[in-house]
Amino acid sequence: MKQHLTYRLLSVIPAVLCGAVLAFVRIPHPASIAVAIAAAAVCAALAVLAFCVRKQFGSELAGGSTAVTFASSIVGLLLLACFAVSVYSLYFAPPAERIAVTNTTVVLLADLFSLLAAVYFLLSALIPSLLANQGARLLWAMTPVLYCAFRILSDFIATGTMPLANGGGYHILGMIFAMLFLLCEAKLIAKKGKPFAYLACGQIAIVLNAAYNVPLLADFKGATTAELLHGVMFLAFALYIAVRLFTLPYAQPQTEEAIEQA
C-alpha cells in the first residue's frame, strides 16, 4: 500500500509543486526567458517521470469518488459561468460594453461546446447513471475536448500577430495540454488509452495552467471579467486533472495464464 501511495503522489505532487513555484516566480517576472526555459525543462522532466511510473497504473478510469465528483462539479459550474458571461458580453451587454470578436463563428462554437462540456461534467458528478452507456459517455467526453480546441483557436485569432506575447505561450500550451489530457481521458473510456500519455499530458497541463493563470489572477487590473473567469476555470481544470491522476487505478497484476498467453 505504501508503494502504491508513493506512485500516486509522484503522479501529482511534483507537477503541483513545480506549477506553484513557476507561478510565483512569474508574478514579478512575467516575461522572463529564464523562467520559460525552466518551465520547458520541468515539462520535459515530468514527461520522463510519467514514462518511469506508467507501468504502475491501469488503462482505465476510477469510479466516481467524492474528490472526482467535487472537481467535476466545480469545472461544470465554471464552464456554465463562462458560457453565460460570453453570451452576455456578445449580445446582451450595453452596446458600448459589448466585446468585438474577430471570428464570430469560432466564438459561437467555443460557447456551444462550453455549454455541452458543462452538462457533461455536471452529469458525471451528479447523475452518472445517465452516462452508463459507454458510447454515450464517449460522445459526451469529446465535448470538453472540442471546447478546448475552439477556445485555443479563438484566443489564437484574438491575439493577432503576437499570440505568444505577455505569457501567451504558457496560455496556449496550457490549453493544448489540457485538451490532450481530455482526449487521453476519452481514449481511456474507449479502452484504447495509455497511462503514459494520460500522465504526461496531465502533469504538463497542471504546470502550464498554474504558471499562466495564477499570475493573471494576482495582477488582474488589465484583464477583463471573461479573461479572469477563464483563468479560474483552467485552474479548476488543473484541479480536476490532479484529482484524476491521483485516483488513476493501479495496474492489475497479470495472472500466470495471461503471462503464458502473452
In which residue ranges do the predicted regions lie?
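Alpha-helical transmembrane segments of polytopic membrane proteins
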Residues: 31-46, 69-87, 101-119, 166-178, ...
